[in-house]
Amino acid sequence: MISMASWQLLLLLCVATYGEPLAKVAPLVKPGSTGQQSGPQELVNAWEKESRYAESKPGSAGLRARRSSPCPPVEGPAGRQRPLCASRSRLIPAPRGAVLVQREKDLSTYNWNSFGLRYGRRQAARAARG
């Protein structure tokens, strides 16, 4: 009896989640009157017959095409479309008139943490003492 109640509760939760009316998915039938109990296979067959489930199967024609770029397209010159954020650079622009600082080419002069990120420069005085 407890397993029957838990099966009905599970079915009710699934139906409530997907928004299907209960009578459409599993019609209420008294098991004593017909001599048969509706098993899980009958419920699966009823579920597969639904049009929404058939559309979401892989290989169906109802699949939506995804856009390749998260940026909205913008009309450019000559009617061509280009993504809005394609022209933006990921680099931080240097302020105008500022002198560019040259980066250290020798990476062995930096301290590295356990994640492979550098966090400071090694000092020559410590290396000579140590």
From Swiss-Prot:
* Phosphotyrosine: residues carrying this PTM: 110
| Record protein name field | Metastasis-suppressor KiSS-1
* Tissues and organs where the protein is expressed, per its UniProt entry: Weak in all tissue types with highest levels in lung and 15- 17-day embryos. Expressed in areas of the hypothalamus implicated in the neuroendocrine regulation of gonadotropin secretion, including the anteroventral periventricular nucleus, the periventricular nucleus, and the arcuate nucleus.
Q: Where is the signal peptide?
A: 1-19
Q: Write down the InterPro entries for this protein, in alphabetical order.
A: Metastasis-suppressor_KiSS-1
Taxonomic superkingdom: Eukaryota
Q: What high-level taxonomic lineage is stated for the organism?
A: Eukaryota, Metazoa, Chordata, Craniata, Vertebrata
Keywords of the record, alphabetical order, are:
Amidation, Cleavage on pair of basic residues, Disulfide bond, Phosphoprotein, Secreted, Signal
